[in-house]
């Protein structure tokens, strides 16, 4: 009896331990149809480019084993395909030698190959327009692409339907306008994929030493510097298991199978096997701020690249020197400073310090409504440097103060004056 009791204890301990093990994502099999476009005229070269870029996104994102098909489904054919998948999953269906889904045909072998994937993705164009804007003397192109994600492994359930709107314009070439619209698809598609819960990376801490942690998975699953992972805490209430976010980690370095992270905050101590969950972001911090420099008021915004960059992060910014702006019924003078630079991010828990520097140009639009006169010109060259101290008030928002210096040199000293000096300011940052 003692031996049986000890054995039962070990079995129960084993089962409980197995239930507490963290989840670690592995690559999923995914099949991607070619782009369906029935009802829309799309240049053949553009069609091939869209197909290639869509395939590249699913391949480069790192978390899938991808195989594609040359077949294209229309919106009507998509529903027929889903219905056929469901009938096949339910069994007792005579499998034909050839399927027809709208305008597309699949052989029995092609259909079975697709149903062998865990997920099937069907992209379909729902809008494609190219037109010449005579007033602006510009070609414009707009594309709306729908993506339907079908979980073939579980009764052909549609797990997500995403729509991506892109546009492009060019003054000299229609083809260039189309390509600009096409090139805008991949970054939006990647973000959409990473936002779908079934595709988000789950992983665990391998080792914790103070604020530095080693994390299972790396470039082999598409992790990048600047990615953020939530620390997940599991609680059990009776027979209900609940989870909540209990902290935040930013990825600071990535190797092939292991990544290094920095703990920004955590509500409890961390150890090996702590569960982590990917937070999908577009990879940009959007800052709104108000600066004062040498008596000049400078409201503005800044966009800093966060995904793929750490600790050096490039940024672009726009600010308006209010002291040089004139808006009346007679004349409008609107100056805008465009700034390009980089910051060096140093996190210290919820706080961070970020020295930064940048250079810029001032663009001025002058309009005289009574006589219909308008002109645009570059008026200043500028530079700025300083430091930022920020505090992470929540997972997605920072508050910060800036101290530094600005200097703006006029290109035309007859009509414009230099300005700048000690800069102080404050703002709010949204992690998008």
Predicted segment positions?
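N-terminal segment of the mature soluble domain
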Residues: 33, 40-121, 159, 234
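Amphipathic beta-strand/beta-sheet edge segments enriched in Tyr/Trp
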Residues: 116-169, 258
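Short secondary-structure boundary motifs at beta->alpha junctions and helix caps
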Residues: 150-184, 238-257, 375-378, 404, ...
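Beta-strand/loop-dominated core regions that host nucleotide or nucleotide-derived cofactor-binding catalytic loops
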Residues: 167-171, 186, 190, 198-203, ...
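Short glycine/proline- and aromatic-enriched beta-strand/turn motifs that initiate or cap beta-hairpins
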Residues: 281-310, 431
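Gram-negative (and chloroplast) outer-membrane scaffold detector with strong preference
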Residues: 302-388, 393-397, 429-431
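Outer-membrane beta-barrel "beta-signal"
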Residues: 419-432
